[in-house]
């Protein structure tokens, strides 16, 4: 039944299909997926135990509406958002485009979300920490489009939300908010990192703060970000967001490209950052993961964890169980005793 429903959704406008999927998940209309976790896939990172390295990327559950259903589908962790202080509609529609032949999506959503207050209420009402003590929930935050001072928005969001999640992500890399990626320039990036760390200390918090990076940065920007990350002892980087390079799908649409065409580009950046930081900064690898071999490749280049999104939308609710079981088998076949042994093998 669920496979039929998924095939039906793939014939709809992508944003309509997404909205229907969210409503179905809220109503409990999804398969209850069970499988036995294996210690071979477990890791402890930032003092938190991840049952597997597989999480859901930000962008799917923007308003923290389906935390429980997503975790019930087999994800070890989910990342909510991106949330902004005030609700905003985002960019004009249509703003999501499928390219099945390329296993890709292009989106120009523009941080559409219901705002911080509804987001906060949804997390609080979910009681996920009581119901899912063995799962991890991250919160991805960003600035409103009209904001002149990005730090004021980030400070407000951090103050309100840092107690509600297991880690915080600062989104500096969406191509759909004008000027956002300028904050990856060394001076701006260092200022944001420093201020968020000060704010965390002021709140007597130890929550990990990660930064989501663009795949389109220059070699010099990589070096600058790596140096700043090491100097400030940041908790982690998410590599990478979507790309403005859409040459692989031969499209001139506005927005960011995700899916299979991003795989090799994100892999290179993962390997580069792992090398530049001597493996001292934790990396969540994102971009073009469709099977267990893809996960293993990203981890061998230096990722400790991975996130999927596009392949989940293409392959449906059983995809995560399939990835997890395949990964467990692959790890054993290659002679590893633990998933953590894989990290950085090819860097």
Outline where the language-model segments fall:
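Catalytic cores of alpha/beta
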Residues: 63-70, 155, 217-231, 275, ...
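Active-site-adjacent beta->alpha loops and helix N-cap segments on the catalytic face
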Residues: 86-95, 116-117, 176-205, 216-220, ...
